[in-house]
Amino acid sequence: MEVKPKLYYFQGRGRMESIRWLLATAGVEFEEEFLETREQYEKLQKDGCLLFGQVPLVEIDGMLLTQTRAILSYLAAKYNLYGKDLKERVRIDMYADGTQDLMMMIIGAPFKAPQEKEESLALAVKRAKNRYFPVFEKILKDHGEAFLVGNQLSWADIQLLEAILMVEEVSAPVLSDFPLLQAFKTRISNIPTIKKFLQPGSQRKPPPDGHYVDVVRTVLKF
């Protein structure tokens, strides 16, 4: 029996959420250990589990993986979500890096002072509408397929949907000028494993609240 991947992170989205999305889309069951105390974090460091002293940490296939980008690349390749050749793979990388840049503007916002937080979220919505979503709308139009790369689901599609939903939590009508992205959102959301992940009771995490921010600050001492 294959051992389930184990995820070590806070009980919130942060940099782990995209990893949860990939595993859930691949239909892979996983376990989670939530960091709630400084002692848990220090033990992981003492045991040599954190390569650069940082989480996310994923235990999978007999390995302890850190660094979000490396983990996502490994999972995408392992679960056939990384294209059919090198040219498709580099496009998937470009698109995923773009959506990650957009999402990080939102992920980091709760840790800022109230006014800075609102400014960061407003900037994220503006960038989504003026920089990122026009690009993906054009990609879908030019490619003429149901997916961003090739003719099958990839990491790029999954992470774009994650980004869309995250921006919509800040500004619900953000896709109003992007009909192809609206259709894309509906289409990808209805893939069975993704549809299940989007239902209440899944391992998808809610938007961060004050408690999550306090726990992260306490554990990481910042």
UniProtKB/Swiss-Prot annotation:
Keywords: Acetylation, Cytoplasm, Transferase. It is found in: Cytoplasm. Glutathione binds at Y9, Q54, V55, Q67, T68. Residues 3-83 form the GST N-terminal domain. The modification N-acetylmethionine is found at M1. The keyword Transferase applies. It is an enzyme of class 2 (transferase). GO terms for cellular component: cytosol; mitochondrion. Its EC number is 2.5.1.18. One of its GO terms (molecular function) is glutathione transferase activity. InterPro entries: Glutathione-S-Trfase_C-like (IPR010987), Glutathione-S-Trfase_C_sf (IPR036282), Glutathione_S-Trfase (IPR040079), Glutathione_S-Trfase_N (IPR004045), GST_alpha (IPR003080), GST_C (IPR004046), GST_superfamily (IPR050213), Thioredoxin-like_sf (IPR036249). Residues 85-208 form the GST C-terminal domain. Gene3D superfamilies: 1.20.1050.10, Glutaredoxin. GO terms for biological process: cellular response to lithium ion; glutathione metabolic process; response to herbicide; response to nicotine; response to zinc ion; xenobiotic metabolic process. Conjugation of reduced glutathione to a wide number of exogenous and endogenous hydrophobic electrophiles. Homodimer. Belongs to the GST superfamily. Alpha family. This is Glutathione S-transferase alpha-4. The lineage of its organism: Eukaryota, Metazoa, Chordata, Craniata, Vertebrata.
